[in-house]
Amino acid sequence: MSDNSDTNVSMQDHDQQFADPVVVPQSTDTKDENTSDKDTVDSGNVTTTESTERAESTSNIPPLDGEEKEAKSEPQQPEDNAETAATEQVSSSNGPATDDAQATLNTDSSEANEIVKKEEGSDERKRPREEDTKNSDGDTKDEGDNKDEDDDEDDDDDDDDEDDDDEAPTKRRRQERNRFLDIEAEVSDDEDEDEDEEDSELVREGFITHGDDEDDEASAPGARRDDRLHRQLDQDLNKTSEEDAQRLAKELRERYGRSSSKQYRAAAQDGYVPQRFLLPSVDTATIWGVRCRPGKEKELIRKLLKKKFNLDRAMGKKKLKILSIFQRDNYTGRIYIEAPKQSVIEKFCNGVPDIYISQKLLIPVQELPLLLKPNKSDDVALEEGSYVRIKRGIYKGDLAMVDQISENNLEVMLKIVPRLDYGKFDEIDPTTQQRKSRRPTFAHRAPPQLFNPTMALRLDQANLYKRDDRHFTYKNEDYIDGYLYKSFRIQHVETKNIQPTVEELARFGSKEGAVDLTSVSQSIKKAQAAKVTFQPGDRIEVLNGEQRGSKGIVTRTTKDIATIKLNGFTTPLEFPISTLRKIFEPGDHVTVINGEHQGDAGLVLMVEQGQVTFMSTQTSREVTITANNLSKSIDTTATSSEYALHDIVELSAKNVACIIQAGHDIFKVIDETGKVSTITKGSILSKINTARARVSSVDANGNEIKIGDTIVEKVGSRREGQVLYIQTQQIFVVSKKIVENAGVFVVNPSNVEAVASKDNMLSNKMDLSKMNPEIISKMGPPSSKTFQQPIQSRGGREVALGKTVRIRSAGYKGQLGIVKDVNGDKATVELHSKNKHITIDKHKLTYYNREGGEGITYDELVNRRGRVPQARMGPSYVSAPRNMATGGIAAGAAATSSGLSGGMTPGWSSFDGGKTPAVNAHGGSGGGGVSSWGGASTWGGQGNGGASAWGGAGGGASAWGGQGTGATSTWGGASAWGNKSSWGGASTWASGGESNGAMSTWGGTGDRSAYGGASTWGGNNNNKSTRDGGASAWGNQDDGNRSAWNNQGNKSNYGGNSTWGGH
């Protein structure tokens, strides 16, 4: 593309100097004079007259090749001629020009254009080409081609030089890049080559014209002015852009630089510091943590600081390199010292008390930012007149006022309300008769009262010294205007969250006791804000801010912010809790939630300046307290967390009482005499646990009464109730039918009778008469069902109660006692030896009968339903051998079956075949050769043939007291079953004749069979077996020489061996 592209560039188009040139195809149509002239004027705001004449001439006369060559070959006109020709063109522009004049003008304009082209070569690239100008230039394209080649080469060289000079200072504006991402596109040289090829292609096709044809477009003076104006405009724009950039940078620094520093300083004050500033550098000295006594941190910091100043003054220029000393409230028992070496710290801390220099720790670098992070200190700066509380001594918890502060801030002088007893409780030495003062203690301290010099003079004059009318010294302590002035260490004083009550503040008021409520409210405002709690629904009033005096209702609360719906506002607003105050009205029921009267309740009487006065339901006195310490409540009854209604409390070593009205600190009680009184919480020694108390009494009928039994009065109003407690000869009873004194009354046990006693309920279930041997001995032989003891029901009672036990665990192992109480797995045992009660696991006890006997464990006791084994008397302790026979055994041996041994036993559980009848004892045998189911004696007695076993002595003696001689009846003489004999002679079950052992009716005949001769149980013996018990008929038939039960002998079962499997 030619450098000489377009000279018709207006001032307005100069702003588009960076835009790409517009390519317009060459127009083949010939335009008339008027159209060409109009288009030329519209194409730019600044157009030279030479360009206008050239456009008119070229639009009317087609270009000729020969004429163009001649015009180029002519010498250039001087500058004056060019200006004259331009003037002539202006004068002749109104009329039509002739052909010769037109040719002359064309030649002159082309020469003038050549002069201006060299100066405008660098600016032609930057100027966009207008559409109409390109159309007008198309007619002159052929004329430029007719110039000489030498002129073209010279012009091109000059233009290239000028282009190089102009392109050097020109710089493109750098595109703003992202500082974090590399998003710059790479541009290759191939794209430039492609653009050059496209331009050459467009030139060949005629869409882009060369600048050679534009020599006639502008004259030298107009082009020079344009160039000067354009350059001046460029300079102005560059200067303006630089000024704008500097001004913008200055504004940014002023606007944001100042605010950022403010924000940084504010953030630093709030405790925020960028972490990069907290990190230690290479030159940072090490920090060591040194152990010290807890609570002495601040005091040690002050001591070490003083020591550092003293050492620096003493050592002069050679100072100890201690850079800093500090402590953190979060890390108790440790101070931190910054020094370059460990030896410096050891030398510096040597000799300082309460510092354990051997226990020091180097702080790691990673923990230094957290250690050095600034935090708001929670320490309260003490000032004269501020309130504090004392931490120790007899004044522990008392409110005090700061009077003076020492210079080193280690001690404070406090104004305290004294607690003095003036020697009332001092002891007197009996030998020397001198007063021995007792040191006051916190448990026995006197109530707070102002110092009374009259009382001190009367009771303890020796320790009183008067300095003036207002100042006294008593026991080496100063009292001014009745107040004690005493010095305390700063660590013995509590300075945080002090919330004094109105009563405490009244003691520090004037002599008349008046208190300025406004000053009180201001003094405790911060302390109250720390504990004040607002709940949704509380009515409040705004104290500070734009909405001061507005009232509303709390809708939501957070830690420090409360959302309030104010009256007259639709949108809820948020306020700090410290700017709010609760609202109460006379008649509201309130409860104290903070302070000394916490838990008290009452009815609001008066509200004045944030102070609420209400009538306490406990003390029936007026109490004044700040509004934010109250809460509106529906239940006006305040109770204590330690004592409740109907609790039995101990007032002294001998007096007890029952609480009939429980409050926070005041209680109404009824004592054992029935007197109702009001006491304080401090008057109660302890609470009696009635669930574990083992006290009892006896009613008018002699029945035992215990706690929990229901009783009724025998005389009077016959009040009925449940026993709460038994004290000596009085019973505390509570009734649901009585309203007075919460249903509690006191009655003597001799005037009541038990209605539902536990012992009565147990006695009704057990029939002890059935266990009396004397009553049982008068009864007939009991049956098996009659003998079985009834199963006793536990009825909810512990089976171990009242049992005699032996301890199996260490400590009291082997000792006997009786179980008095059982609570879960623990049993209270009263020892027989020491008359002492101990508590022990009930599974570690062995349970016995009261008379002795075999012991069992607790599990066995439960399985036996509380029954313990009976004690054995006399021969019953002898056990039977294991080879015991069911029938008779060898002579001289003692045998038993089912625990039946020989001897005399009066009990039913040991059936030993003596005089006592034994039921269902199939196998008891006597000594000698007595047989039991085939011999003469069947129940252990001795007989000779027909002797019965139901009596023992004599051969014919009756077992039930009768005497017989063989044939007599064993049930008292004469036969009771039809004839004379039933168990010894002929049975009357089949024959009615008189028999003395003739024949048996049990299946066969025998000589003397019934229970003595040949047995008829399954066999038939006609050989008249010996009457001494020959052959047995149990499944075998014998001549009498053998027993039917594998027993061999020549003797009868009356006197021989037993027939039950033994020899």
Curated annotation (Swiss-Prot):
Stretches with biased composition (Polar residues): 1-11, 74-112, 1043-1057
Domain KOW: 382-415, 533-560, 584-615, 799-832
One matching Pfam family: KOW1_SPT5
Composition-biased stretches (Gly residues): 942-965
Gene Ontology cellular component annotations, sorted alphabetically: chromatin; DSIF complex; mitochondrion; nucleus; rDNA heterochromatin
Molecular function per GO: DNA binding; histone binding; mRNA binding; protein-containing complex binding; RNA polymerase I core binding; RNA polymerase I general transcription initiation factor binding; RNA polymerase II complex binding; rRNA binding
GO biological processes: chromatin remodeling; intracellular mRNA localization; negative regulation of transcription elongation by RNA polymerase I; positive regulation of autophagy; positive regulation of transcription elongation by RNA polymerase I; positive regulation of transcription elongation by RNA polymerase II; regulation of DNA-templated transcription; regulation of rRNA processing
Low complexity bias: start-end ranges: 966-993
Residue numbers of Phosphothreonine PTMs: 35, 133
Predominant cellular place of this UniProt entry's protein: nucleus
Segments of skewed composition (Basic and acidic residues): 29-41, 114-144
Coiled coil spans: none
InterPro entries: KOW (IPR005824), KOW_Spt5_1 (IPR041973), KOW_Spt5_2 (IPR041975), KOW_Spt5_3 (IPR041976), KOW_Spt5_4 (IPR041977), KOW_Spt5_5 (IPR041978), NGN-domain (IPR005100), NGN-like_dom (IPR006645)
Compartments in which it is found: Nucleus; Mitochondrion; Chromosome
Biased composition, class Acidic residues, residue ranges: 145-167, 183-200
Sequence repeat residue intervals: 931-936, 937-942, 948-953, 958-963, 969-974, 975-980, 981-986, 987-992, 1000-1005, 1009-1014, 1015-1020, 1032-1037, 1043-1048, 1052-1057, 1058-1063
Keywords annotated in UniProt: Chromosome, Mitochondrion, mRNA processing, Nucleus, Phosphoprotein, Repeat, Transcription
Annotated domain remarks: The C-terminal repeats are critical for activity.
Family, as annotated: Belongs to the SPT5 family.
Function per UniProt: The SPT4-SPT5 complex mediates both activation and inhibition of transcription elongation, and plays a role in pre-mRNA processing. This complex seems to be important for the stability of the RNA polymerase II elongation machinery on the chromatin template but not for the inherent ability of this machinery to translocate down the gene.
Assembly description: Component of the SPT4-SPT5 complex. Interacts with RNA polymerase II. Interacts with SHE2.
Other observations noted: It is phosphorylated in a PKA-dependent manner in vitro.
Protein's name in the database: Transcription elongation factor SPT5
Organism from which the protein derives: Saccharomyces cerevisiae (strain ATCC 204508 / S288c)
The encoding gene: SPT5
